[in-house]
Design a protein with these regions (language model features):
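Non-catalytic structural scaffold of enzyme domains
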Residues: 1-177
């Protein structure tokens, strides 16, 4: 963290959901602005969605990171049941081995299960999950919230609001989120 700040970083993002277990501790000692993937993701939940599915690693679920912040926003999180969570993890590992088709066969039924249990939106709370879902978004009956994309949009908003950036960009040069 301090190496980034010493190199001139004025904003730091951590593109890993599970690593946000340490976010508050890091933020407490950081001089640079830090953007939370959790806050960015939850901020992208459609206002009409009160019941939100969560697909994430076992570690992210066990830490309760999303659960605590979602509850504070009045959201109810729906997680896969134990057998379904085992398949989510298997899908992640299968993708890492390079077999996207097999990973989709494992993960897509878990998405259907969350929707059947009332999910009005689903958080893809692991950076591999959007890679598995890619190409199937239109067939899914609710919004899929990509935590990495949410973090990127939040970082772009920070960048565009930074005084040095505002002064140097014209309207056409501004990034849109």
């Amino acid at each position: 963290l301090h190496m980034l700040e010493d190199a001139g970083a004025e904003c730091i993002v951590i593109p890993c959901n599970t690593a946000h277990y340490w976010f508050d501790d890091l933020q407490n000692v950081a001089k640079a602005r830090m953007i939370s993937i959790l806050d960015a993701t939850l901020g992208d939940i459609p206002p009409s969605a009160r019941y939100v599915g969560l697909l994430a690693t076992n570690a992210t679920l066990a830490t309760g990171l999303y659960q605590k912040k979602a509850l504070a926003r009045g959201l109810t999180l729906i997680q896969p049941e134990d057998a379904g969570q085992a398949l989510v993890m298997q899908a992640i590992y299968t993708l890492k081995r390079g077999d996207k088709t097999a990973a989709q066969a494992l993960l897509l039924p878990q998405i259907d299960s969350l929707i059947a249990r009332g999910a009005q939106a689903i958080i893809m709370g692991c950076t591999e999950i959007p890679l598995i879902v890619a190409g199937h978004e239109r067939a899914i009956a609710c919004p899929m919230i990509d935590s990495t994309a949410s973090l990127v949009r939040a970082a772009i908003r920070w960048y565009e609001s930074w005084p040095d950036t505002r002064a140097s960009l014209t309207g056409e040069q501004r990034l849109t989120a």
